Amino acid sequence: TIAEQVGLSHTPCWRRIKRLQESGVISANVALVNAKKVGLGVVVFVTVKLNSHDEQILAQFESAAVAMDEVMQCYIMSGDVDYLLRVVVQSIEQYEQTLKRKLVNLPGVAALNSSFALRELKNQHLLPWQLVSTGNLQH
């Protein structure tokens, strides 16, 4: 159990977990589903350039992009592109339809570039705790 691993009894451990959840350090408890096993084996990284950096356009794009079921992650980027999306679909054909029907119609899109992942080498969900200051966890 977690309590045994951290050297606490059950009740203090549970209280600590609750405090970490309430403070936002623990943001969710989830079961990770293997995308390939459920038929979503095509991963596409899409870079997006917008035609304007007007706050309204940015807000509209972000709202529409994060509402898309196919978009697993959306990052605001520095550098040559404005956003990076990680998209999952069943097939290249399905991605083509997503591109034509949804992505190109997102507000403010000037250019899209799609890169298909050939194979996943690492997809880690555990944080590198050795890099975290323990002072940050005093919640």
Predicted regions, residues:
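A compositional/biophysical signature of low hydrophobicity enriched in polar/charged and small residues
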Residues: 1-139
